[in-house]
Amino acid sequence: MYKIGVLPLNGFALMSYASLVEPFRAANFLSEKKYYKVINFSESKEGTVSSSGFKILGDHYIGDTPELDIFFVIAGGDPFKYNNKNLYHWINKLAQNGVTIGGVSGGPIILVKAGLMKEHRMTVHWEHSPSLLEIANEIILEKSLYVIDRNRITCAGGTAPIDMVLAIVKKQQGTKFAQLVSDWFLHNEIRPSGGPQRSNLVNRVGTTNKFALSAIELMENHLADPLTLNQLAELNTVSKRQLNRIFKKYFDKGTMEYYRELRLDKAKNLLRNSSLSIAEISHMTGFYSSSHFSSLFMNYFDLPPTQYRNSDQISYINRIR
């Protein structure tokens, strides 16, 4: 029997938790054998509360030593603020004892903070990637659904754990059985580990115009060091006037207004999902000063950045992560 430990941290998303544990349960049900045993952990006897208010009680607690093959940490909210040295010490001890260590959604950040991802490839939910690279630029970060690198497993969260668990089941029980488990969840196609976390640019922006798509891709790759309108036009081999006409036609706004809103949306994500300072966020999104950034943010969102960060609007409701 393969024993899987799961530690959700307060603010975790039920979607990530269910996508991780349910395929193991289904594998047992469909095989009529006990291939897998999921063991829930919590930090205290009070249990762990999800972003939607659902509580999970632990079978074991941090520091316990039941026999395990894999141990997963699931984190939501702001994992950058989390700092439990007892947990870091304990999961390092598990790793030293041969347990494969995994992280889901914001969980990979916990593994980085515990010093467990050195010289290992990894992934994390796309909203956390910029902030993670700011604090740990030495990591090997990929934009994948999940990464299995020797004795480390990281997963972006959402529904991606289904594909990750199916990869584990496939390796142990074969392709045919893994597909049977996948079909049980109406999950017709098992996605590869390197599959994209987000829909492609065409679907996200709603146009197939090649000049608009090329310009937006350049914008997304130059948030901290914004390009000028002249540079965007030259790189797309169109005139500034033509590029502005394209953006007016498809987005009802000028090129640079679109670019500024893109940077402000990224700043909003960082305010919601990181503990970076206002100055750091303004720098990461290409605004020359905190005051300039705050003024633009206020005009666009009707709230100053500090008030937005502290408001009830963003209180650990982590959508589907």
What kind of region is each of these model predictions?
Residues 2-63:
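N-terminal beta1-alpha1 cap of cysteine-dependent amidohydrolase-like domains
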Residues 39-101:
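Flexible gly/pro-rich beta->alpha loop and the following alpha-helix that scaffold active-site loops
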Residues 90-127:
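Catalytic nucleophile loop
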Residues 117-145, 180-181:
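A conserved active-site-flanking secondary-structure segment within enzyme catalytic domains
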Residues 146-155, 172-217, 221, 235, ...:
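Short, Lys/Arg-enriched, Trp-marked, Pro/Gly-tolerant hinge/linker segments that flank
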Residues 170-174, 211-228, 247, 268-277, ...:
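Basic, amphipathic alpha-helical hairpins
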Residues 218-220, 229-262, 282-307:
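Basic/polar phosphate-binding segments, predominantly the helix-turn-helix DNA-binding elements
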Residues 273, 277, 291-321:
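…primarily DNA-binding HTH/wHTH and HhH modules…
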